[in-house]
Amino acid sequence: MDVFMKGLSKAKEGVVAAAEKTKQGVAEAAGKTKEGVLYVGSKTKEGVVHGVATVAEKTKEQVTNVGGAVVTGVTAVAQKTVEGAGSIAAATGFIKKDQLGKNEEGAPQEGILQDMPVDPDNEAYEMPSEEGYQDYEPEA
C-alpha cells in the first residue's frame, strides 16, 4: 500500500506542477492575446478613421462633380422645355411662328436660363434679371 500511496503522491505532484505550468501558460497566452487584440483594435481604428476621412473626401468631390452635371443637365432640360413650349404655342396659334425665338428688335432670343450664371462650386445662384422676361399677352 505504501507503493500505492507513493505513486499517488508523485502523481499529485505531477498534476500540481502541470497545473502550475498550465496556469502560467494560460496567463501568458492571455496576456499575448490581449496585446494582440489591442494592437489589431488600434490599427483597425486608425484604418477606419482614415477610411472614413477618405470616403468623406471622395464623396464631397463626387457631389461637386455631380452637382455641376445636374445643374448643367437641368439647365439643358429647362431650355428644351421652353423651346418645346414655344413650338407648341406656335403650332396652336397662340403666337406667330415668325415671333418664335425673336426678341422685340427681331434678333434671335437667347434662352432665359442661358443667361443665368451657373457655378457648381458655389451654393448661391443668382436669378436672371427681369430684362430677360417678356410679358405674354394673348391675341384676342
Swiss-Prot record:
Residues 111-140 are annotated as: Interaction with SERF1A. The modification Phosphoserine is found at residues 87, 129. This is Alpha-synuclein. Cu cation binds at residues 2, 50. It holds the Pfam family Synuclein. Keywords: Acetylation, Cell projection, Copper, Cytoplasm, Membrane, Metal-binding, Nucleus, Phosphoprotein, Repeat, Secreted, Synapse, Ubl conjugation. Signal peptide: none annotated. The modification N-acetylmethionine is found at residue 1. Soluble monomer. Homotetramer. A dynamic intracellular population of tetramers and monomers coexists normally and the tetramer plays an essential role in maintaining homeostasis. Interacts with UCHL1. Interacts with phospholipase D and histones. Interacts (via N-terminus) with synphilin-1/SNCAIP; this interaction promotes formation of SNCA inclusions in the cytoplasm. Interacts with CALM1. Interacts with STXBP1; this interaction controls SNCA self-replicating aggregation. Interacts with SNARE components VAMP2 and SNAP25; these interactions allows SNARE complex assembly and integrity. Residues 100-140 are annotated as: Disordered. Neuronal protein that plays several roles in synaptic activity such as regulation of synaptic vesicle trafficking and subsequent neurotransmitter release. Participates as a monomer in synaptic vesicle exocytosis by enhancing vesicle priming, fusion and dilation of exocytotic fusion pores. Mechanistically, acts by increasing local Ca(2+) release from microdomains which is essential for the enhancement of ATP-induced exocytosis. The modification Phosphotyrosine is found at residue 125. One of its GO terms (molecular function) is cuprous ion binding. It comes from the Eukaryota. GO terms for cellular component: axon terminus; cytoplasm; cytosol; extracellular space; membrane; neuronal cell body; nucleus. The gene is SNCA. One of its GO terms (biological process) is chemical synaptic transmission. Phosphorylated, predominantly on serine residues. Phosphorylated on Tyr-125 upon osmotic stress. Ubiquitinated. The predominant conjugate is the diubiquitinated form. Belongs to the synuclein family. Residues 118-140 have a biased composition (Acidic residues). It is found in: Cytoplasm; Membrane; Nucleus; Synapse.
